[in-house]
């Protein structure tokens, strides 16, 4: 009996070792399998990244085949090799009445740091359990530590508006904003957040009504750039880029910034975030999700360099690239 047990343990650990492959990455390979430093697939979809004391932290949706299982956080010093930190925000498995009761949908989490309160504040798109995508709310959670665990605070429709795909943006002066798809995704809106970043203020404006979602924003010099997708469920579509020198508009449509094979479908992906690279002037990475609705956990990541040259933005497909290839923007 004892021998059988030992044999089973040895065999099982062999299977485990064989299935978990840890690779030391030296380059980005968009849309390829990307494992964490333990050799498990990175499970952080619709995500965003912040930089804290020499490390990047990647927050994203933890997905099962279809299930929404909370928000994961990973850390990395080099943007290529990611260590799984923890489930940063869990669904509530105890209180079935909670807005984030197990069975809810949490999408597109973004985290920013509030210098005044010393808290990391997470906003995400929340759909209530059993209601499909009807609730259209924003959820807010906080933590004193970047890796969490985050405490759920509240969920609401900002100023009464439906809120689905979303992102957060913290400006250089510390003011922060929530950019969100509203009115059944026909409108894209922006609201300035309260000083503690926990609520929207009444400064809440329509950006444009082009039926767009998946907002990803960045600032270069005096301009704000906003990448969005069309609304075709999990299927990819054409991206567009808007520019403004004021977050509340007017926003000018600059067309599709993607270049290369399948660029008219965002290379098979959908925008989620634009990440400023530390220590490189005006260097940004475009982050997108290549969704696999039949097995959401296996949705892949498309990370590509953004080039900004005198206000002209280009995102060119690359099979394989590294940060050395990134040029400072003009
Ligand atoms: C597109 C959105 O961008 C995703 O985040 C997700 O909500 C899917 N629609 C669901 O169909």
Q: Where do the protein language model's features map onto the residues?
A:
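Bacterial Sec-dependent N-terminal signal peptides
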Residues: 1-22
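Carbohydrate-active catalytic/glycan-binding domains of CAZyme proteins
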Residues: 20-330
């Amino acid at each position: 009996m004892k021998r059988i047990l030992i044999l089973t343990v040895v065999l099982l650990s062999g299977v485990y070792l064989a299935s978990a492959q840890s690779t030391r990455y030296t380059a980005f390979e968009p849309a390829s399998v990307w494992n964490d430093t333990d050799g498990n697939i990175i499970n952080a979809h619709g995500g965003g990244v912040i930089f804290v004391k020499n490390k990047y932290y990647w927050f994203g949706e933890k997905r099962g085949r279809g299930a929404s299982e909370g928000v994961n956080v990973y850390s990395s010093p080099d943007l290529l090799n990611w260590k799984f930190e923890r489930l940063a925000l869990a669904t509530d498995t105890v209180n079935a009445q909670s807005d984030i009761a197990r069975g809810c949908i949490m999408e597109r989490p973004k985290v920013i740091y509030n210098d005044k309160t010393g808290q990391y504040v997470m906003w995400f798109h929340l759909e209530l359990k059993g209601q499909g995508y009807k609730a259209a709310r924003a959820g807010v959670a906080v933590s004193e530590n970047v890796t969490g665990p985050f405490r759920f605070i509240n969920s609401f429709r900002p100023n009464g508006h439906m809120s689905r795909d979303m992102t957060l943006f913290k400006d250089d002066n510390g003011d922060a904003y929530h950019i969100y798809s509203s009115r059944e995704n026909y409108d894209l809106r922006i609201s300035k957040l309260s000083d503690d970043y926990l609520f929207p203020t009444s400064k809440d404006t329509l950006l444009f009504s082009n039926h767009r979602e998946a907002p990803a924003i960045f600032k270069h010099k005096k301009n704000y750039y906003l990448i969005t997708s069309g609304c075709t469920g999990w299927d990819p579509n054409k991206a567009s880029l808007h520019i403004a020198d004021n977050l509340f508009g007017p926003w000018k449509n600059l067309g599709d910034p993607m270049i290369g094979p399948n660029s008219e479908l965002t290379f098979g992906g959908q925008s989620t975030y634009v990440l400023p690279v530390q220590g490189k002037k005006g260097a940004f990475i475009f982050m997108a999700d290549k969704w696999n609705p039949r097995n959401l956990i296996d949705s892949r990541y498309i990370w590509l360099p953004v080039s900004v040259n005198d206000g002209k933005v280009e995102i060119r497909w690359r099979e394989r690239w590294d940060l050395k290839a990134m040029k400072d923007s003009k």
